[in-house]
Amino acid sequence: MKKVLSNGTEYIYKNGELPEAIRLGDLKAALIRGNHKSALLKQETIEKAFIVEVNHGYQLPLLPRHALLLPDARASPLGVASQFSINDTGGIIEKDRVIHDLSHEGEVSKESINSMIDDDSLSHCPLVYGHMHSRCVHYIVATRYLYPQARILGSKADYKSAYRRQHLSSKASFHSMTQATLVQSMFILLALRLTFGGKVCPFDWCTISEPVVDLANALLDCDSWDPSSIHSPSQHLVPATKYLPDSIPLAAARELLVDVPVSEFGRVDGYIDDLPTFGPDLSPLHRSKLAAASFLAIHITGRDVSSLDLFPRQSLLASNKLAAEGGLCEALIVLGWLYNTRALTVSLPSHKHIAWKNSITDAIDSKSMLPSELETLIGRLNHMASIMTMSRHFLSRLRYYFDKSKEPNKKYSRIFFNKSVIHDLNLWLLFLDKAYNGISMNILVFRKPTHIYRTDACEYGLGGSFSDGTLWRWAIPHDLLHRAHISLLEFMGMLIPIWMDVLNGSLSLHDCILSLGDSSNAVGWMVKSNFKSAEENLPDQLAKLEVSRTLASLILSEDLILWSQWMCGDDNIIPDICSRDWHLLDNDLINNLTSLFSNSNQQRIPHFKMRPVPKEIDLFLCSVLQKLPKNPLRFKTPKTSGFDPGVDGKNSFSPSACKAMFSWKHLLSHKEMQSVSPSAKPSAKETLKANSKESNVEPYGIPSDMYRRPLSLV
């Protein structure tokens, strides 16, 4: 921190500076090109913003003729991004943010400031704010679980012009030049403070802001701190605590899989310039600490405003937002989501629900969108998918159309959608309504699984087991053989037991599913289906999308949590037997399994029983396979599991295999698999082994910064 504050933010390039001729070529081209279209369309916004910036000493204005005289100068364009903010009373207002696009490539070098940055130079402060939303939700659920009868209160503190509080080094300023029209004259502007668009800026700002969060948490835990006597000068602006009606019951929290430390005085977290605070309402002292800690921490670290300053300065704390967001309450907007700590829900605010729904409805009516509109829509839906992860399965077609619109030599004035995309957009309308009505925090956290499914597949059949010893298997009809590649069959197999339990009524609201399989591709597709494996062709991809959409619809409609995990094939014995041993009738297969367990000297022998695959699922599987052409390259000679004493097979299970079959904890701590996450990506077994060094092993393979804030980051 001392280096950053003393020397300013520096741009360190991995391959050094550009050659002088190339730099000058980039600079001249940038000055001729000017700013992005979004900035040109909002000249008044640019002028208003930069007059304020110049008056506060954040930008240094120069005449255009000075641009080529500055040593090492480089220029990047401005843009304007529209977003929502709140006014002093908490009302939603549209706000334009000026963006300094340091990712824009130079005309000659084909390099941008951001692309040249040496990533190794950014390691001085880890960026943990990306998981702040997840940590807050985990903390709220853990607090309710520990204090089931207590209200949970929250508030939010904001920095005023956060990035403008840290200065750039002189060289970085020369490399952060832009241009704008101010008072009817063109000026060259040197950025003297952190820019909105610089790759380095979040790292250097977090070097300053993360210790402030640490300080706020230290204040909460400090027994000698009396917030009534030591507090921010703006504390009197914080409104009184607001409670939701008692008619709304306190929602119960489900038990977590991970250990989240809960302090009786609450916790503060941080996302760049936002500092949300949450804690239990246990006494007046608890409330007063919760209401003051983050504001005092920001005040302590900021220099007092003085009339002697050469440039007008504002308080580090955004006092204008205190009335709207500073007071303790049970309903608070954090990162664009409405947290209801009483009902334990996260929901899409009404203004976003209306705007986003209108955008989708217009696209459905016209069956088309402008490329810029589609890009905005994808960003919005991806934001929504942060709490409805399974909805990402329905983004792939939209992304495909947007990527097509960017192909070289193709300029699309409008993008026209086919029936499949229109179907996806109609589903997104349902998802938007669901998000607006609220998603339970209990399905947004890492929880102990309530249902465990193990599955396997071969070229001739699918099979698996439930945790109570129930078995299932499905033989691929003869005329549908040799169509699907094995990864797709494995994926279909992982869908079946979930669907069976939904139809059977065995899954309850907010249940947590752990789906286990020995295909890394299929395990990854359970949560992310827009990537393509080497053996896939177009019909394969369409079939995979059909399966993934069916899976996502089940999970979303039933409000379930789905985790998927790879397991070693040697431990996946029962599903392997169910999928391969078609020479055995159901009763013979069950007797064989019972005999194998008996011969393994197991104290607990499962009560095996076979459950038939429902007709609805059978018809779906057949319809998927019927759409695939036969492929001679996918012909495989039938092969049994080898666990059949009647044909000189193995007559018992190994102890480790028996343990793996019925112990999910054994699987979660398995050294070959350190990923239990909704965003898990498929990878080869060798990669999994390479990434399982003891020094990197965390509980159940879940990154700890997803559920608890690291201490003393800087």
Features from the language model and the residues they span:
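Amphipathic alpha-helical
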Residues: L40, F50-H56, F402-N442
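Metal-dependent nuclease catalytic cores in nucleic-acid-processing enzymes
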Residues: R135-Y145, E210-D214, L488-H510, E546-S557
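A conserved non-catalytic segment of reverse transcriptases
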Residues: T89, T178, M186-L192, D269, ...
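Catalytic-core region of right-hand nucleic acid polymerases
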Residues: L41, T45-F50, V54-L220, S347-R397, ...
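C-terminal functional segments of enzyme domains
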Residues: I333, L338-L344, E558-I617
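A short, polar/acidic, helix/strand-boundary loop motif
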Residues: S185-E210, D246-L250, D362, S467-M492, ...
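RNase H catalytic domain
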Residues: V268-I272, G279, W499-I573, I577-W582
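Catalytic palm subdomain of template-directed nucleic-acid polymerases
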Residues: E107-D119, R165-L168, P233-S307, T341-V346, ...
